[in-house]
Amino acid sequence: MVLLKFHGGCQQIGMSCVEVETQKGRVLLDCGMSPDTGEIPKVDDKAVDAVIVSHAHLDHCGAIPFYKFKKIYCTHPTADLMFITWRDTLNLTKAYKEEDIQHAMENIECLNYYEERQITENIKFKFYNAGHILGSASIYLEVDGKKILYTGDINEGVSRTLLPADTDIDEIDVLIIESTYGSPLDIKPARKTLERQLIEEISETIENGGKVIIPVFAIGRAQEILLIINNYIRSGKLRDVPIYTDGSLIHATAVYMSYINWLNPKIKNMVENRINPFGEIKKADESLVFNKEPCIIVSTSGMVQGGPVLKYLKLLKDPKNKLILTGYQAEGTLGRELEEGAKEIQPFKNKIPIRGKVVKIEFSAHGDYNSLVRYIKKIPKPEKAIVMHGERYQSLSFAMTIWKTLKIPTFVPVRGTILPI
């Protein structure tokens, strides 16, 4: 019998970790850290044959250096991006040591999409494209004859940087699926609409002589935003002003350029036509950022919780300047305070009065509710489904949707749940 043990990522976003246990072997699907609290799953690394990583975001891979795993499987881009995620975590929190990162990197084995790997005599797996960030994968396992699809984070729609998630997948017994936007209330505007809103907000500020600060996540969101802005500048629909970048997004964007064959083919075509899709990456020079000329500043971190973006927030003293939030802002973060209309913030010693405009235009690398519904209709019908990686309301809502749509048993585990399959 195969057991699924849920160590995290249940009725929450963060700390994703599922253990697949058999009598002859066991593997972990992701081993993430909570972005809010730094909490990690409690697992026995000595008993685990391997960790299979879906992608390089902190909530899916951040806990790996805490442990001494024998083997870590991921795609080639994910290995490079995980190094950036781990080094960022080390710099910000001192959660682990450089030697821990080195140990993890030395035990990574990289695979391409669709390439099969046997881990133990009764466990083999392969990766499908998940469409979430560069190198992101859904994990397809065959364990004691059972076929399990762990989606990781998926986006069934096309983005500027990536092709959509694969849906032409082998037969499935058990589906383990994310539910970030699992509620019928989680229907997002079309990507073109969001892009127009972003450019209109930037244009308004630039034309008034102001500066635009855009906090981003280093991997995925940063590249999408840079691609959009540079595309509109090239087309003449946005004034050509300096774009300054700061933080680990500079290294992450270099990784994106290194793996151009893993991206949307349109990006490869741009490069072959001598166009830099992400624009010239200029490290922010504070003497230029804080002068009187209009500019755009794209910097980590996405939730304004640490990172170099904090030093640019004093620009919001000036009503001409603007902050554009492009993603989810967790409870307790400075980003959430700003989103909720804080009139004053204190990222450092001195308080900063907020006179500039703060707007939110959410660009998500996750599929919205409609996208998730399309996904479950396109893939082979599983015998049962398990819903995780979503807040309680979203997970329970999407479990109900799966039941109504596919008429199959659907589970919403909590941390510590053990399910026999």
Curated annotation (Swiss-Prot):
Enumerate the Pfam families for this protein. Answer: Beta-Casp, Lactamase_B, RMMBL
Q: How is its activity regulated?
A: Inhibited by imidazole.
Please verify whether the record's keywords include Transport. no
What residues bind Zn(2+) 2, as annotated? 59-60, 153, 389
Please give the cofactor(s) recorded in the UniProt entry for this protein: Zn(2+)
Which GO molecular-function terms appear in the entry?
metal ion binding; RNA endonuclease activity; RNA exonuclease activity
Q: Which UniProt keywords apply?
A: Exonuclease, Hydrolase, Metal-binding, Nuclease, Zinc
Check the record and name the InterPro entries matching this protein. Answer: Beta_Casp, MBL, Metallo-B-lactamas, RibonucZ/Hydroxyglut_hydro, RMMBL
What residues bind Zn(2+) 1, as annotated?
A: 55, 57, 132, 153
Q: Which cysteines are joined by disulfide bonds?
A: none
Q: How is the cofactor bound?
A: Optimal NaCl concentration is 100 mM for nuclease activity on RNA.
Reported temperature dependence: Optimum temperature is 60 degrees Celsius for nuclease activity on RNA.
EC number(s) per UniProt?
3.1.-.-
Q: Key word Kinase present in the record?
A: no
What is the protein's quaternary organization? Forms homodimers on heating to 60 degrees Celsius which may be the active form.
- Report the family membership: Belongs to the metallo-beta-lactamase superfamily. RNA-metabolizing metallo-beta-lactamase-like family.
What is this protein's function? A 5'-3' exoribonuclease with a strong reference for 5'-monophosphorylated RNA and no endoribonuclease activty.
Name of protein = RNase J-like protein
Organism for this UniProt entry = Methanocaldococcus jannaschii (strain ATCC 43067 / DSM 2661 / JAL-1 / JCM 10045 / NBRC 100440) (Methanococcus jannaschii)
